[in-house]
Amino acid sequence: MMTTKRTAIRRRLAVGRAPNGPPWRGRKRGHEAIVAPLAATLAATAAVGLGVVLARAGRDRRAARAQLARVRQFAMLPGEGLATGLERIGLGQLDLAIEMLATEDGQTLSESAVHEARKALKRLRALIRLLEDELGGQVFARENAVLREAGRRLSAARDAEVIVATLEDLMRRHPGELAHRRGVVRLHAALRAERERVVQQSLADGSTAADALDELRGVRRRAMAWSLSDRPGIEAVEPALKRLYGRGRRRYRRAALGSGSRTLALHAWRKRVKELRYAAEMLDRADLDDRDGARASRTPHGLTPVRAGGKLVRRGRKRRRKQARRRREALYIRRVARRADELGELLGAEHDLAVLAGRVRSQADPAGAPVAGRGTRRALLRLIAKRRRRLRRQALREGKRLYRRGPKRFAARVRSASAAASRG
């Protein structure tokens, strides 16, 4: 009897310990059976928590980028006054230039960073020229000189890049006349070698960027003390805007008459055109939709078909036409900016060709060795002159459209457009 009971107990224990026996039959939960589900739960909770943290971090980064882009928007924001907007634009462009030029110890600047910094400096010079009356002549002269010198420090690499790109563009336009000439190939190779040398030297020279950076930080500190009057509309900058436009108009007339050096006249005109472009971009409203001016209606004559009482009636003619006129008027500043941008591109291409022509005439690489024979030089200069004549004709035609008004009428039109944009 005792043996039978012991045998039965052993059998039950064996069933409880059997790995393939019925689940938990005759046994209690072990340590592993408790820890494993708990560990899985904790791991899942940690993964969810980490996912939430990463999602929040990504959202915060996107929000920060959006806020930074908004602060650095080179235009008036919705509901923003002129003084507030120009102060934001000035500080935003200064911060952008400083950020592009600031590097860690031992690091070199990138070409794209230098390019963005130079663009910001050009915009800043246009801004303080627009604020000349507000800042005063002494402050304007000081800051303009500082910004001009900072831009000059960064210009060597860009100038070397432009002359290579100009020759390559000419080669693409006239492959049949230039591709087979060894002198053109040698000139191209010499200019590319010079570009690489200048770019590497400029980017590796930390003192150049450091000096420009110190100057810009000084401007940034002084800019915090600028006091701009919050007068309605564009009243605060209207005198400067008329002067800026008038200078460009006079330069256009000199270039059209062809008196003196045509190359110098066109280059001086180009500077005034770029100032006008940046001024118009700053005064433009970022929230305006380019399509608004064309949305008079989807039916002829700006009428809206409305079915009422079983008949087709047309309503809203005057209201819709008035809205369309106001939208077109509000977009006038943007049209000026775009025309000035296109004109500046034409004048810039003409000037780049003039620089290339000077290099071709010198018939030597930077080391003084001749790179092109007489026939190659004649062919290049002939094609350059032909291209320059075409660009000049286009530029003068566009300039006539852009500068057809007098300074007073132009400023009045900008004032009206700014008011229309503010009304929405």
Q: Where do the PLM segments sit?
A:
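Function-determining surface determinants
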Residues: 3-295, 306-424
